[in-house]
C-alpha cells in the first residue's frame, strides 16, 4: 500500500532538466559546449510549486554511454539528449522535457520581467561587477556597475539590497570565487530561477 500511495503522489509532479551553456566554453575533445549549469526542476502540477536541485558540473557520472566524465561534458558529447540520458541513468529519473539557455536568453528573460531584487554580500558585489563586463560584451546589453559600499569586516555577510537588470543577475549567477565556491554558485543560480518563476507567475500573459 505504501508503494502504491507513493506512486500516486509522485504522478502529481513533472520533472524538467534545465541547462545553462556558455558558447565560449567549448569542449575541445568533444567539439560541443559544456553545460556549466545543470538543474533538475520538479513542478507540482496542482500547486505549481517548483523544487530545484543542482548537479555540480564537476561530478563524475556515467554520461549514459558507459563513459565516465564530468557531468557538464554530457551536453558537449550529445547536446540535451545526452545530458538528459546522463541524468536519467545516474539518478533513476524519467526526464523528457528540458530547457537550455545561454547568457543572452537569460538576460532577456530577466529584463522582460523588469529585473530582480537581490540581497547580496560585499564579495558578491565585487565579483558581479567584474563578470558584468564580460556578460555585457557577450550579450550586447548595457548595465550600470554597482558602486561599492565601504568594505565591511565580514565581506561574505549578506547585508546589501539591489535591483539587478538582466546583465547583472546573469553575472550574479556566474559568481564562484566567494568562500562558498561552486556550492554558492549553484545556490545563486537556484535563487535567480525561483525569482524568475515567482515574477512570471504574477506577470501578465504578455510578459510570460
Model region roles, listed by residue range:
Residues 1-208:
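Non-catalytic, solvent-exposed segments at the cell envelope interface
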Amino acid at each position: 500500500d505504501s508503494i502504491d500511495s507513493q506512486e500516486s503522489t509522485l504522478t502529481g509532479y513533472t520533472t524538467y532538466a534545465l541547462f545553462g551553456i556558455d558558447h565560449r566554453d567549448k569542449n575541445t575533445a568533444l567539439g560541443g559546449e559544456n553545460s556549466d549549469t545543470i538543474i533538475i526542476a520538479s513542478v507540482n502540477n496542482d500547486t505549481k510549486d517548483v523544487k530545484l536541485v543542482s548537479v555540480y558540473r564537476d561530478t563524475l557520472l556515467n554520461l549514459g554511454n558507459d563513459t565516465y566524465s564530468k557531468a557538464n561534458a554530457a551536453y558537449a558529447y550529445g547536446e540535451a539528449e545526452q545530458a538528459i540520458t546522463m541524468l536519467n541513468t545516474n539518478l533513476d529519473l524519467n526526464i523528457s522535457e528540458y530547457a537550455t539557455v545561454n547568457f543572452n536568453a537569460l538576460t532577456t528573460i530577466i529584463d522582460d520581467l523588469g529585473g530582480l531584487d537581490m540581497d547580496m554580500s560585499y564579495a558578491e558585489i565585487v565579483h558581479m561587477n567584474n563578470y558584468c563586463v564580460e556578460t555585457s560584451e557577450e550579450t550586447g546589453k548595457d548595465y550600470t556597475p554597482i558602486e561599492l559600499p565601504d568594505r565591511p569586516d565580514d565581506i561574505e555577510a549578506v547585508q546589501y539590497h539591489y535591483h539587478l537588470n538582466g546583465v547583472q543577475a546573469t553575472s550574479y549567477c556566474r559568481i564562484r570565487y566567494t568562500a562558498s565556491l561552486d556550492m554558492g554558485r549553484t545556490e545563486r543560480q537556484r535563487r535567480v530561477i525561483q525569482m524568475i518563476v515567482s515574477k512570471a507567475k504574477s506577470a501578465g500573459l504578455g510578459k510570460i
